Amino acid sequence: MISSNDFRPGVSIVLDGSVWRVIDFLHVKPGKGSAFVRTTLKNVQSGKVLEKTFRAGETVPQATLEKITMQHTYKEGDEFVFMDMESYEEGRLSAAQIGDRVKYLKEGMEVNVIRWGEQVLEVELANSVVLEVIQTDPGVKGDTATGGTKPAIVETGATVMVPLFISQGERIKIDTRDDKYLGRE
């Protein structure tokens, strides 16, 4: 159990049978009446955002999350096969369980799998990945009227906006959180 006074961004709680992560909180102490904590919560499974107010000192169950380091070994049909780096056991996850970051997942890549009990809540990739550009238009000298970027398709199939000087076959670094080009590798 965790007190609402101990809420901080990133704390996970159980509310109505599902896991919610505290995104933002504000401890309010009005002149009249009792203090309360206004929170913004995000459902870890669905991504739904909720604003909820708790009385100061109110206790709620804290979610005990387990973080496991796994390596993506191969893809079989619609499932991705991962190997636990400690026990060497295999596990399978669907693209829906991995989420939108599946477009940066490559064989041999290590990820952190966040579990609540036996249920997989999310898969965390590294903040940046290095991938090879497999298709992009050639940059034309002096063509900067469009802001100096062009679309490029990387080896995993994801499309990323890159500067005009990037050519096919180059390895680039991409931020997986906001799909931005970070530089050449």
From Swiss-Prot:
It is found in: Cytoplasm. One of its GO terms (biological process) is peptide biosynthetic process. Keywords: Cytoplasm, Elongation factor, Protein biosynthesis. One of its GO terms (molecular function) is translation elongation factor activity. Its main location: cytoplasm. InterPro entries: Elong-fact-P_C, NA-bd_OB-fold, Rib_uL2_dom2, Transl_elong_fac_P/YeiP, Transl_elong_KOW-like, Transl_elong_P/YeiP_cen, Transl_elong_P/YeiP_CS, Transl_elongation_fac_P. The keyword ATP-binding does not apply. Pathway: Protein biosynthesis; polypeptide chain elongation. Pfam families: EFP, EFP_N, Elong-fact-P_C. Belongs to the elongation factor P family. HAMAP family: EF_P. This is Elongation factor P. The lineage of its organism: Bacteria, Bacillati, Cyanobacteriota, Cyanophyceae, Nostocales.
